[in-house]
Amino acid sequence: MSVAMQRCPRCGNESSGESYACSFCGKRLRIERIERIPFFRRIEEDWFNPYPWYLKILYLIINPARAFWDINHLRKKSPGMLILLFSSLLYGLIGLVLFNRFRISGASITFTSAYSIAFFLMFFLFGFIYQFLLFYFLIWIYTKGANYSVGFTQRLEKRFGIGRQKQGTIEEKKLSPFSIYKGGTLLQKQEAFKSKMMLCAFTPLMIMNIVKLIVLAIGFNPRGPVVLGESTIDSFLAASMKLPIWSVVDALDAITLAAWVPILITIAIRELSNSSTYRVLITSYLISITVSIFIFFLRPTLFG
């Protein structure tokens, strides 16, 4: 059965009828209404060199469409793991802030310094493990949703093949003479690096960790001092976790996951699969809202 094709008006490359942008020069072939919103507008500029990692992260915050447009051209340089690392370091700083808010009676400088480092490392490791598991679980479930809405995995297999490709084994028929047209994407010449690229969509949770750090630094006030010999810091910390401030922290995480993350994950999936923005956005929001309810809104700390 023949497959409908469409020709790019800018570079002349032929793309499948289901493509929304030319795979080589980036020219939009089909335009959805939602792409009139700046956050979702596809970038059609020529690409020459990748942005530095810090500029990628900045654009993920202020202009995610541009960020993922750049990342998609050289996906192996995606800052996804850096974002996970920075977010985990912020967890460590949160632990440091919590410890410094304790009033410890009769503690020496050596004791305080040792416990400060211990709290930082403990929260850093917890943040890394927790977020690693959470992010990859979300990537898995977002992929399932995108498979339902736009056939995400099938599109990736069609564009990039299955598994790792050895350099120089690309079939000539899959390449266009326009594949290097003004910095064209050469999407067929690199692996999908799906997880690395989709990790970037969790930048909002990293930003929210900064907000949580500020909120806890201002609003975390444990009741009474820690008297060494009468109570342990562990038991005191457990009691402090019941303070109302944690409801605010949990709500910030829930709102971010339900409202902000779906926008970035939609653009990441759209750029990877060259698919519909609108259809991916619907499933991403449904998944995000559902997960935020189960993971965050059902936490005991949210309701005291």
Predicted regions and their residues:
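Short metal-coordination and nucleic-acid-contact micro-motifs, chiefly zinc-binding Cys/His arrays
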Residues: A4, E18
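Short, contiguous pre-domain boundary segments
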Residues: I34-W53
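Hydrophobic alpha-helical transmembrane segments and adjacent short intramembrane/lumenal linkers
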Residues: G168, E172-G304
